[in-house]
């Protein structure tokens, strides 16, 4: 079997198809990545034993290393869902988006990024972003056009929109963390628990330390009276639930069952 005789660091058609499809999507949640992996095995090597996802991705990364590309794993800041993105390590700046967006569109993203990083909440309002349209480099852009470009950023999973405000998608954080740290050293916020870049989260009202929502959920998971890990003062915020992939999977199965039932009834 190809799966059992393959040497480490060599890509098969299974790996190549997986990589090609991941490149098409840009970023996927972990359950989607597992489904994609199984699909690629069924298409190219039906009889092989499916590698553990971590080993499978490590194998691809060992080949991509010389190209300065890597499949990186992260989590969504709002609810802790594991995600995977194909990251270009050769350039950390906004310029890595240049193949999909025009110069003035990239500059709009930079303006939005700066507002998001500078904000206390990790969000920038569409009004504040659109007010900077006159300052864009390159071809002039009307506000109506800028609104459409912001939606393109959302569709491409660079930004997330919630009630007229924008924040960074997990894909943007995975791809641009180094660039953000270097470009906005005075505005950058770090999580006190995982020590990685924090865009949105909770903060201690006494000492000011910040924590990602998923880190808050895990840290205070079995604590009746949550206290700040730094100053030990009372933690005044609501504690979010820890993301449970099994519960999510069951909800997905239930949802698809209801959908198929509705389809049969029509």
Curated annotation (Swiss-Prot):
Location of region: Interaction with NSMCE3: 1-102
Gene Ontology biological process terms from the UniProt entry: DNA damage response; double-strand break repair via homologous recombination
Main location: nucleus
Keyword Glycosyltransferase among record annotations: no
Basic residues composition bias: residue spans: 256-266
One Pfam family this sequence matches: SMC_Nse1
ZnF locations on chain (RING-type): 191-232
PTM characteristics: Ubiquitinated.
Catalytic reaction equation(s): S-ubiquitinyl-[E2 ubiquitin-conjugating enzyme]-L-cysteine + [acceptor protein]-L-lysine = [E2 ubiquitin-conjugating enzyme]-L-cysteine + N(6)-ubiquitinyl-[acceptor protein]-L-lysine
EC number: 2.3.2.27
Entry keyword Zinc: yes
Location in or out of the cell: Nucleus; Chromosome, Telomere
GO MF, one example: ubiquitin-protein transferase activity
Broad EC category: transferase
GO cellular component, one term: chromosome, centromeric region
Family label: Belongs to the NSE1 family.
Function (record text): RING-type zinc finger-containing E3 ubiquitin ligase that assembles with melanoma antigen protein (MAGE) to catalyze the direct transfer of ubiquitin from E2 ubiquitin-conjugating enzyme to a specific substrate. Within MAGE-RING ubiquitin ligase complex, MAGE stimulates and specifies ubiquitin ligase activity likely through recruitment and/or stabilization of the E2 ubiquitin-conjugating enzyme at the E3:substrate complex. Involved in maintenance of genome integrity, DNA damage response and DNA repair.
Subunit structure: Component of the SMC5-SMC6 complex which consists at least of SMC5, SMC6, NSMCE2, NSMCE1, NSMCE4A or EID3 and NSMCE3. NSMCE1, NSMCE4A or EID3 and NSMCE3 probably form a subcomplex that bridges the head domains of the SMC5-SMC6 heterodimer. Interacts with NSMCE3.
The protein's name in its UniProt record: Non-structural maintenance of chromosomes element 1 homolog
Organism name: Rattus norvegicus
